[in-house]
A protein has these predicted regions:
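Two-component histidine phosphotransfer core
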Residues: 1-172, 182, 186
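C-terminal end segment of the histidine kinase catalytic
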Residues: 173-199
């Protein structure tokens, strides 16, 4: 039986999440947004993924300091990190826990996305941001199969950070096989809006 028949309220909520999520993905990506808005978009994505994978497979917690909720951040930097966790970190049978944190630092803002998934080797981590790699870094699933694309998503987020915040800001990845992965986004100083294109 479909979700519409068995849980109509949940189905209605998911439809709203999907509509809002899809609308935002088509919006202007050249304009800064607030951290709160990024978190809302990330939450919509998580809600959709939880419905897809079933209750209990994804456990997500968010801890955003009140002082940084209105901070300006590059658009579409959180959802790709969450997607990476789900696509590349999940074990075959165990639930995946993801924790998102954001807080003010002496230099600006720090956002951390961490999971307790399968993790990565030092070799894979060392090559995540190499643009010249012809093939994406590999991540190995619990059944020994290979997943690709993790590095491309991270590289795109890094490029977006540099576009709005400059080279003084960036991203670091810490990971341990069998333990999990932590992605640290560092937004230092003040962002800048790129000049509009002229005809």
């Amino acid at each position: 039986m479909s979700l519409v028949r068995t849980e109509p309220d949940k189905a209605r909520s998911l439809l709203i999440d999907f509509s809002n999520y899809y609308r935002q993905t088509l919006s202007d990506s050249d304009t800064l947004t607030t951290l709160e808005h990024e978190v809302e978009q990330g939450t919509r994505y998580i809600n959709l993924m939880q419905a897809r994978y079933g209750d209990g497979r994804l456990r997500v917690s968010v801890d955003i300091d009140f002082e940084v909720r209105d901070s300006l951040v590059p658009p579409f930097i959180l959802q790709p990190l969450l997607e990476n966790c789900i696509k590349h970190a999940q074990r075959e049978t165990e639930p995946l826990s993801i924790h998102v944190r954001a807080f003010e630092t002496d230099d600006g803002l720090e956002i951390i996305v961490e999971d307790d998934g399968i993790g990565m080797s030092e070799e894979v981590c060392a090559h995540l941001f190499e643009q010249h790699r012809r093939e994406e870094p590999e991540s190995i699933t619990a059944d020994g199969s290979v997943k690709r694309g993790c590095g491309l998503a991270l590289f795109n987020v890094l490029q977006r950070i540099h576009f709005f915040y400059g080279e003084d800001s960036g991203m670091r990845v810490k990971s341990q096989e069998g333990v999990g992965t932590q992605v640290i986004v560092e937004l230092n100083g003040e962002p800048h809006e790129p000049a509009p294109l002229t005809a």
